[in-house]
C-alpha cells in the first residue's frame, strides 16, 4: 500500500489526466464558454456545454497545464475570483436550461495572489458554496487529482462527490499543515498521515460517496457511474433535489 504522502505525489504528477482528457473521453460536442460577464476571463477554470450519451450537460472544472509554461499561465490550476464567478455563471445557465452539471476538481487551492485578494477571493468562494448548494439541477463532482482547500470546495458542493483512488482532498497542503503545526514543512509526510486526506480515508468520513479505480478501465467506470447516478438524480423533482443535498451536508462530520 502507498503512504499518504506518496499519494500526494501521484495526485500532483504532471502527467495525470487533465480536464481536457476527461472531456474528450466522456463527452461529445464540447463547446467552451468563457468569461465571467463582468469583464474578465480566467483560463484556470474550463467550462462549457457538451452531450453525455445524448443528454445536454454543463461541464466545469479546474484546468492545469501540460508543461511549466502553460502551468504558469494557468496558475497551476489555482483559480482567481474571476474563475469562480465564471463557474457560477455557467452553473446558473445550466439551471436555467435544466442541464445537469459535472465538475472536475484538481487544484492545490484558490489562487493566493494580491490581485485575487483585492478582487474578492473569499467572497467569490463563499458565493459559489451558497449558489451550488441551492441549484435545482443535479450536480456531480469528481476529485481527479489535488482537492485543495476552499479552491476545491467551491466546485465540490454536489449531490454526488467521487474521488479517483489516487486523488487527495484536504483543507490545505501537507507542507502547509506541517509548517503551521510544527513550523517545519519538511514534516509533510508525517502531516499527510494525520490529515486523513486519501480517498479511502475521506470515504470513511462520509464526505465523498465513492472511489473510482484508476487504470485501463478508469474512463469506462467513470462513464458507468455517471450514467447510473444521473439516471437517478434526473428523476428527482427540484424540491427533493435541493432538500436531499442540504441533508447530505448537514450529516457530514463528527459532533
Spans of features found by a protein language model:
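General structural feature for long, well-ordered alpha-helical segments within catalytic domains
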Residues: 4-6, 18-26, 83-90, 103, ...
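Glycine-rich beta-alpha loop segments
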Residues: 25, 29, 39-41, 47, ...
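Intrinsically disordered, low-complexity segments enriched in small/flexible residues
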Residues: 1-57, 61-64, 76, 224-255
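Alpha-helix capping at helix-to-loop junctions
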Residues: 32, 93-96, 110, 134
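Conserved catalytic cores of soluble enzyme domains
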Residues: 105-227, 235
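Short active-site-adjacent helix-start/loop capping segments
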Residues: 18, 66-69, 111-113
